[in-house]
Amino acid sequence: MRKYETIFILNPSFDEETVKANIEKFKGVIENGGGTVENVDFWGKRKLAYEISKVSEGFYTLVNFTANPELPRELDRIFRITDGVIRHIIVNEQV
């Protein structure tokens, strides 16, 4: 098992319930894939450094998790097909 960190940005037009539902969905992908979520840090709505698809704000969320090396690939696929995910990144935490 390896430690990973992901940050994803959701569309600012989402209401609070939709944002929370998406966070729970991504946590579920991690847990159903055999991983464990260690920390979820919701940063709220923040201004982007530059416009992405004509959007200048987004809901930021940081998630630390432990998983097998195959899980980040599946999580990346889920991020890509989910409407409303503006940007995401998954990195391996160095011990």
Curated annotation (Swiss-Prot):
Transmembrane segments: none annotated. GO terms for cellular component: cytoplasm; ribonucleoprotein complex; ribosome. HAMAP family: Ribosomal_bS6. Keywords: Ribonucleoprotein, Ribosomal protein, RNA-binding, rRNA-binding. InterPro entries: Ribosomal_bS6, Ribosomal_bS6_sf, Ribosomal_S6_plastid/chlpt, Transl_elong_EF1B/ribsomal_bS6. SUPFAM superfamilies: Ribosomal protein S6. Binds together with bS18 to 16S ribosomal RNA. It comes from Clostridium beijerinckii (strain ATCC 51743 / NCIMB 8052) (Clostridium acetobutylicum). Belongs to the bacterial ribosomal protein bS6 family. One of its GO terms (biological process) is translation. The keyword Transmembrane does not apply. Pfam families: Ribosomal_S6. This is Small ribosomal subunit protein bS6. GO terms for molecular function: small ribosomal subunit rRNA binding; structural constituent of ribosome. It comes from the Bacteria.
